[in-house]
């Protein structure tokens, strides 16, 4: 049975009670926390930095959470070091944000973190050609990065299918993560095209009952496994 993972994006959380929101979604069954870092240069928004995460890591009831960091910054290397020192689990970056993709991959690995390469909707898949054997995760953006609450771009489904085929053909243990506009109406289709990790923000944090919402996502994904 395929294991699907839910990564709750705190970009959609209530910032006035961020620690409590994170605790609540983890308690409700989220597998990890997706931590979007934006610098108002690479994308036109400004979000969290390492200081906020360091503070969250000090909260006893959530300090062991799995952290999936998505860097939408330029440059990235200095921030990679700061986040890696906070014992994050995954660090994903965009190939356009560095002068040397392979060097940045090595930097992340040198700190013992898993490496993700993040691709915007218009980023060509040829950027994967020389690094597929060096990364642990491919993060496909299914919205234009920068702001929460956007609608899923339908054409990304074909991109998911192609990347899934590339991963399977490589026979590498690479996870495929999709981020943007995922909800209860479209997660079945997104999963059926080969996604492993679903970054979900508004659909969880804007819901009244995290337990019920996350359970509903799990129920849909169970149906995928039943049909295989």
From Swiss-Prot:
<feature type="binding site">
    <location>
        <begin position="179"/>
        <end position="181"/>
    </location>
    <ligand>
        <name>substrate</name>
    </ligand>
</feature>
<dbReference type="InterPro" id="IPR011060">
    <property type="entry name" value="RibuloseP-bd_barrel"/>
</dbReference>
<feature type="binding site">
    <location>
        <position position="36"/>
    </location>
    <ligand>
        <name>a divalent metal cation</name>
    </ligand>
</feature>
<feature type="binding site">
    <location>
        <position position="70"/>
    </location>
    <ligand>
        <name>a divalent metal cation</name>
    </ligand>
</feature>
<dbReference type="InterPro" id="IPR000056">
    <property type="entry name" value="Ribul_P_3_epim-like"/>
</dbReference>
<protein>
    <recommendedName>
        <fullName>Ribulose-phosphate 3-epimerase</fullName>
        <ecNumber>5.1.3.1</ecNumber>
    </recommendedName>
</protein>
<comment type="similarity">
    <text>Belongs to the ribulose-phosphate 3-epimerase family.</text>
</comment>
<keyword id="KW-0479">Metal-binding</keyword>
<dbReference type="GO" id="GO:0046872">
    <property type="term" value="F:metal ion binding"/>
</dbReference>
<feature type="active site" description="Proton donor">
    <location>
        <position position="179"/>
    </location>
</feature>
<feature type="binding site">
    <location>
        <position position="179"/>
    </location>
    <ligand>
        <name>a divalent metal cation</name>
    </ligand>
</feature>
<feature type="active site" description="Proton acceptor">
    <location>
        <position position="36"/>
    </location>
</feature>
<dbReference type="GO" id="GO:0006098">
    <property type="term" value="P:pentose-phosphate shunt"/>
</dbReference>
<dbReference type="GO" id="GO:0004750">
    <property type="term" value="F:D-ribulose-phosphate 3-epimerase activity"/>
</dbReference>
<dbReference type="InterPro" id="IPR013785">
    <property type="entry name" value="Aldolase_TIM"/>
</dbReference>
<feature type="binding site">
    <location>
        <begin position="146"/>
        <end position="149"/>
    </location>
    <ligand>
        <name>substrate</name>
    </ligand>
</feature>
<feature type="binding site">
    <location>
        <position position="70"/>
    </location>
    <ligand>
        <name>substrate</name>
    </ligand>
</feature>
<comment type="function">
    <text>Catalyzes the reversible epimerization of D-ribulose 5-phosphate to D-xylulose 5-phosphate.</text>
</comment>
<feature type="binding site">
    <location>
        <position position="34"/>
    </location>
    <ligand>
        <name>a divalent metal cation</name>
    </ligand>
</feature>
<feature type="binding site">
    <location>
        <begin position="201"/>
        <end position="202"/>
    </location>
    <ligand>
        <name>substrate</name>
    </ligand>
</feature>
<keyword id="KW-0413">Isomerase</keyword>
<dbReference type="Pfam" id="PF00834">
    <property type="entry name" value="Ribul_P_3_epim"/>
</dbReference>
<dbReference type="InterPro" id="IPR026019">
    <property type="entry name" value="Ribul_P_3_epim"/>
</dbReference>
<keyword id="KW-0119">Carbohydrate metabolism</keyword>
<comment type="pathway">
    <text>Carbohydrate degradation.</text>
</comment>
<dbReference type="GO" id="GO:0019323">
    <property type="term" value="P:pentose catabolic process"/>
</dbReference>
<feature type="binding site">
    <location>
        <position position="9"/>
    </location>
    <ligand>
        <name>substrate</name>
    </ligand>
</feature>
């Amino acid at each position: 049975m395929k294991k699907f993972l839910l990564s709750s994006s705190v970009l959609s959380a209530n910032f006035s009670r961020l620690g409590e929101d994170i605790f609540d979604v983890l308690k409700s069954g989220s597998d990890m926390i997706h931590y979007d870092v934006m610098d108002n240069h690479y994308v036109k928004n400004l979000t969290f930095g390492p200081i906020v995460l360091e503070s969250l890591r000090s909260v006893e009831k959530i300090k062991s959470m799995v952290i999936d960091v998505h860097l939408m910054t330029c440059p990235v290397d200095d921030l990679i070091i700061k986040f890696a020192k906070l014992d994050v689990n995954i660090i994903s970056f965009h190939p356009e944000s560095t002068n040397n993709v392979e060097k940045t991959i090595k930097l992340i690995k040198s700190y013992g973190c898993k490496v993700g390469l993040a691709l915007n909707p218009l980023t060509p898949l040829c950027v994967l050609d020389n690094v597929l054997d060096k990364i642990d995760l491919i993060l496909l953006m299914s919205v234009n990065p920068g702001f929460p609450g956007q609608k899923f771009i339908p054409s990304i489904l074909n991109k998911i299918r192609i990347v899934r085929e590339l991963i399977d053909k490589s026979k590498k243990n690479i996870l495929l993560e999709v981020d943007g506009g995922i909800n209860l109406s479209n997660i079945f289709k997104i999963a059926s095209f080969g996604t492993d990790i679903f970054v979900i923000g508004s659909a969880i944090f804007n819901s009244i009952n995290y337990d019920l919402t996350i359970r509903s996502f799990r129920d849909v994904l169970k149906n995928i496994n039943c049909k295989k």
